[in-house]
Regions:
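Acidic, Ser/Thr- and proline-rich intrinsically disordered linker/docking segments
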Residues: 365-425
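Soluble catalytic domains of membrane acyltransferases
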Residues: 27, 31, 43-216, 232-233, ...
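Structural motif
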Residues: 265, 344-346, 378
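Long, charge-rich boundary regions
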Residues: 277-358
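Helix-enriched interaction subdomains in cytosolic or periplasmic regions
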Residues: 17-38
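Short, structured interface segments
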Residues: 214-228
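Cys/His-rich short segments
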Residues: 238-291
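Soluble, non-transmembrane catalytic domains of enzymes that act on hydrophobic metabolites at membranes
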Residues: 1-10, 351-353
Length: 425
């Protein structure tokens, strides 16, 4: 999938009129039928199945909030298989509307910006649930999982649940990540996919529970490990390309601690600095003599610890020359030139376009980062911005910095929150 783009000067892009808010439309049944038919083609090879738990507690025509984990591009087709012919709106990022705004609205999509405060989104969700009596599907993680475990959820999601006061349904998939992990260069594997569809809470239960209780329940529900699931269920993934791109995720060698010198190719993960090599076996384990890690999420968690130490020591810093695309409307992604992206304990600083662009974003702007691999087949991307404009930054050296930057944003946010919290006496 690609995105419509244009080359335009920075001044002209920033002078473009911003789209006015429009209330979301009730999904057109005919289009949802088309999506359902198309989803059959993708789901048939996965032998998709799902189980429901407690769904009888929800009335047949009662609108609900559907919360689904975000594992791969197949997620929306899974939702169509589960809920069709029930009509539901979908909370979608604004980039998905580029070049197809009307179509997305007719499907029932509600636009929002990833990891940018958006009170309008809450009003739109409330409008669909209360006024249009239409369910709303939302991916609370917002971003795809990098390592097959849950992406951190925004704190106080319970406040949103309390405000909407409708039944909450969760959809947790298994196998969708393993079939098409984000790092694996869009190469699909032969993996069966299943899902658990659960009534997490009725409207009455949402009303009775506290925000903290709802947050805790969500954290428990969105707690999973796709690699562990593969291992425990002895799921065989024997494609010869299964380690392709794994260096995007595991960028730091645990033996020599060199960063950016690891290559994931075929079934091997090799450090070009010290020569240490790991094999990714058919059950998702890493194998090597004197292996530091055998479980991919453990390696990823170790990298998180290393970044935490760098932040605490004041030694962490990212500085990259980047190609810059800006999104200010749904007509196109606008290429405006090049610049420098810096990230340190003070947050992000993006400069470029011959000195015309100078944007800063503090470390408390968001709990995580909008980052992606091979975004719309362009390249690995780091996205920052606000409601006025989103800045898509593509490292010119194609280095493996996306995962590290996301980890750094998450750990820096936690550190700043801790320091900001009042000290109890």
């Amino acid at each position: 999938m690609k995105i419509k783009s244009r080359t335009l000067s920075y001044e002209k892009v920033m002078a473009l009129p911003r789209p006015r808010h429009r209330v979301p439309l009730k999904p057109m049944f005919l289009l949802q039928l088309v999506i359902r038919i198309l989803s059959i083609l993708d789901l048939f090879p996965t032998k998709f199945t799902f189980k429901t738990h407690g769904m009888e507690k929800i009335g047949k025509n009662e609108p609900c909030l559907i919360l689904m984990n975000h594992s791969s591009f197949i997620d929306l087709k899974i939702a169509s298989r589960i809920f069709f012919p029930k009509r539901y709106s979908i909370v979608a990022t604004t980039d998905a509307f580029v070049g197809k705004n009307l179509l997305m609205r007719l499907v029932g999509c509600i636009p929002t910006q990833k990891f940018v405060s958006d009170m309008t989104l809450i009003k739109d969700m409330e409008y669909m649930l209360k006024e249009k009596r239409t369910s709303v599907l939302m991916f609370p993680e917002a971003g795809y999982s990098f390592d097959g475990t849950a992406t951190p959820l925004p704190r106080k999601m319970g406040i949103l649940l309390k405000k909407l006061n409708v039944p909450v349904v969760t959809v947790i998939t298994q196998g969708a990540f393993a079939r098409d992990p984000l790092y694996n260069c869009l190469q699909k594997r032969k993996v069966n996919v299943r899902a658990d569809v659960t009534c997490m809470a009725t409207a009455q239960q949402v009303k009775e529970m506290t925000v903290a209780q709802l947050d805790a329940l969500l954290d428990k529900t969105f707690s999973f490990d796709n690699f562990r699931y593969q291992q425990e269920n002895k799921i065989v993934i024997d494609e010869p390309f299964r380690a392709d791109g794994l260096n995007r995720l595991l960028y730091r060698c645990p033996h020599c601690h060199t960063e950016g010198q690891i290559t994931g190719k075929g079934v091997m993960l090799t450090c070009n600095a010290c020569g240490k090599a790991y094999t990714l076996d058919v059950h998702g384990y890493l194998a090597a003599e004197e292996a530091k890690f055998t479980h991919i999420p453990d390696w990823y968690a170790w990298q998180r610890q290393q970044i935490r130490q760098e932040l605490e020591a004041g030694t962490y810093k990212l500085e990259k020359e980047v190609k810059i695309g800006i999104l200010v409307d749904t007509k196109a992604l606008y290429w405006v030139g090049s610049g420098t992206l810096t990230h340190d304990e003070n947050g992000f600083h993006l400069t470029g376009c011959d000195g015309k662009l100078d944007y800063t974003q503090g470390p408390l702007a968001c709990h995580t980062l909008n980052a992606d691999y091979y975004w719309y087949e362009i390249g690995d991307v780091i996205c920052i911005g606000n409601k006025d404009a989103l800045y898509y930054c593509f490292p010119k050296d194609h280095s493996d910095v996306v995962a590290k930057t996301r980890l750094a944003v998450e750990e820096l946010y936690k550190l700043k929150k801790q320091r900001k919290a009042p000290v109890s006496v």
